[in-house]
Amino acid sequence: MNGGKKIGTISTDNSTGKMSSPPKPTTIPHIVKEEVIASGKWLKLEKTTYVDPVGNTRTWETTKRTTRQANAADGVGIIALLKRTLHKDCVVMVKQFRPPMGCCTLEFPAGLIDEGESAEIAALRELKEETGYKGEVVGVTPVTCLDPGLSNCTTQIVMVNINGDDLENTNPTQQLGDGEFVEVLLLPLDEFQREIDDLMKKEKIVVDSKVYIYGMGMSQAFFKPNELRVLKQ
């Protein structure tokens, strides 16, 4: 529950044994006002006043980035596939310590979109900085939300192919900024979820939900649904 938000449920009428439904919508939900509670260099906390589907006025605590550019997503996530002769295709991943989590996380390379950048340009720049690899964009998703119950942060997922036989990619060099400590991991595409699960058993690490969902999708692509490891747990 957040800032007075009520969770809608379907309950049972004990007298009749029939299911009762939530109230029917009577209006279109909309924002009334947004007030800044606190603001830092990168983030701000706001109190959002809104009207719910049945006309009640409520409040919500919302976090927002201070760096958002007009008409653009906040950042990009990069699914980069490294292709090399006589090697399995590998997904390029990054491992780094995240202070909010208090431990290391396994993520796709990612970063904020700078002013004037497209998602494609931002993705290639961030990939080069974080991993040292030079790639080619092969696909871009629409703008998607990250954690809509907490913030208005958005991202675009950019698919990139990396020619591992290219001389520039045989010995990639990261271009990290001050305070950035990023370890690059190459996980075979056909063993992606297994590699993630093994890593979680060996280390104190949290996997980004987007990464794990991608792993489940790859498992479904390579194996029958009833053989998914996650379904056997």
Feature map (PLM): residue ranges:
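Residues in well-ordered beta-strands of folded domains
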Residues: 49, 63, 79, 109, ...
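Short, well-ordered strand-loop elements centered on a beta-strand within folded domains, enriched
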Residues: 30-31, 56-62, 86-95
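Nudix hydrolase/Nudix homology domain
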Residues: 4-25, 29, 103-104, 115, ...
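Short amphipathic beta-strand and strand-loop transition segments with alternating hydrophobic
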Residues: 29-37
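Conserved Nudix-box catalytic region and its N-terminal flanking loop in Nudix hydrolases
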Residues: 10, 68-82, 86-125, 142-145, ...
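Acidic, metal-coordinating catalytic segment for phosphate/diphosphate chemistry
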Residues: 37-79
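Active-site segment of metal-dependent pyrophosphate-handling enzymes
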Residues: 44, 81, 96-100, 105-107, ...
